[in-house]
A protein has these predicted regions:
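Condensing-enzyme catalytic core mediating Claisen C-C bond formation in acyl metabolism
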Residues: 1-61, 173-243, 247, 339, ...
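Short, well-ordered amphipathic alpha-helical segments that serve as non-catalytic structural scaffolds
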Residues: 41-42, 65-79, 111-112, 240-256, ...
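Catalytic phosphate/nucleotide-handling subdomain of diverse soluble enzymes
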Residues: 316-337, 343-352
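Conserved catalytic cysteine-centered active-site region
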Residues: 39-63, 98-156, 282-313
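A contiguous, well-structured pocket-lining segment that forms one wall/lid of small-molecule binding clefts
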Residues: 226-300
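Conserved beta-ketoacyl condensing-enzyme motif
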Residues: 5, 61-132, 258-277
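Flexible, glycine-rich active-site loops centered on histidine and acidic residues
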Residues: 150-183
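Acidic, glycine-rich active-site loops and adjacent beta-strand->loop/helix elements
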Residues: 92-98, 132-137, 161-166, 203-204, ...
């Protein structure tokens, strides 16, 4: 038995934030020293490396669960189902609801419970819980939903990925420019024609890799040292991803009934354009092949890195023909992959 998506939804915040937004920021390095480069140079290098020209921020009156609700409602409409028939709501995020101009995370009750409330679902046996798994959280939620359905514990699951990273960034850290807000969702149920999830794989590296992404103090030493922000060791993450993610993708393909030539698209977490390109190039090199043309759709240029939301948003955009030269047709085999805090990696193969 395989399980497939019957509805996909997204919510892209309306606030467009270009790189010009950061021109007046004062950036420091990890030692608390003001960066020598001017902000125009920093912005130029950011675009060259990550591909990011602009990103989206949630409105001041919105929090992560609001974004997740909008994406969930979109997926339910797309599936044309009664929300009361959903057995599980799995909400992937990392920082809970953080109100504008605060840094305190609110995770009780769970964001999944908040979405269930907003959807007005009365069924008490619709179970709502959160997944904290770094950027791969939405993919992991899909893998868990797949397991629930296969085990006979559910017939229909709603998996949400949403984040408001703009609320947890250090304005004095140039990495702030990478992060964005957004939400995506999908509804999974059993397939009658063996289409859907064909194979999957997850891994956690939690030794020296554990703190490659972490919560740390501002680079501005004059700020309150007890206030924490999202921080990362970019070079270490890049090297880790390039080393581990292609191998995981290959193992997933090799453990399935497909081969590398069957893959129509690779939908990968929108973390960094150069890193994603390097991962896919390394993946194909493991098969002694060049990267096929138009294999990897991207939306990071305009939407930035919204963590768990990047993959479902990207998938919805492809399905809606919103990306030039990227379509998914019936029968296509798509490889999904993500990497993030933990450090966690996951991947699954899906036939449409």
């Amino acid at each position: 038995m395989t399980n497939h998506f019957i509805g996909i939804g997204k919510y892209i915040p309306t606030e467009k934030i270009s790189n010009l937004f950061f021109e007046e920021h004062q950036f420091f390095n990890e030692q608390g020293e003001i960066l020598d480069q001017n902000n125009a140079t920093i912005s130029y290098k950011l675009k060259q490396i990550t591909g990011i020209e602009e990103r989206r921020y949630a409105r001041k009156d919105q929090v992560t669960s609001d974004l997740g609700y909008m994406a969930a409602a979109s997926a339910i409409t797309n599936a044309n189902i009664d929300a009361e028939t959903i057995d599980y709501i799995i909400f992937a995020h990392n920082f809970g609801d953080v109100k504008h101009d605060t840094i305190q995370s609110d995770m009780v009750p769970s964001l999944a419970a908040r979405v269930k409330n907003l959807l007005k679902i009365q069924n008490p046996y619709c179970v709502a819980y959160d997944v904290i798994f770094g950027c791969p959280g939405w993919v992991e939620g899909v893998i868990q939903a797949n397991a629930f359905i296969k085990a006979g514990l559910a017939k229909r699951c709603l998996v949400i990925g949403a984040e408001t990273l703009s609320r947890v960034v250090d304005e004095h850290d140039r990495d702030t420019m990478i992060y964005a807000d957004g939400a995506g969702a999908a509804i999974l149920e059993a397939s009658t024609n063996n289409k859907g999830i064909q194979a999957h794989l997850s891994a956690s590296y939690a030794n020296e890799e554990k703190d490659y992404l972490f919560f740390g103090k501002s680079y501005n030493s004059e700020k309150c040292p007890n206030t924490k922000y999202i921080k990362m060791y970019g070079r270490k993450i890049y090297e880790f991803a390039l080393s581990k993610v292609p191998l995981a993708m290959k193992k997933c393909v090799d453990d399935s009934s497909y081969n590398i030539d069957d893959i129509s698209k690779i939908v990968i977490h929108q973390a960094n354009e150069k890193m994603d390109e390097a991962i896919v190039k390394r993946f194909y090199s493991l098969y002694d092949q060049d990267v096929p043309k138009n294999i990897m759709p991207m939306n990071i240029h305009k939407l930035g890195n919204s963590s768990v939301a990047t993959i479902p948003i990207l998938l919805k955009m492809i399905m809606d023909n919103d990306l030039e030269n990227h379509q998914i047709n019936e029968g296509d085999v798509v490889l999904f992959a993500s990497v993030g805090a933990g450090m966690n990696i996951n991947t699954f193969i899906y036939q449409f």
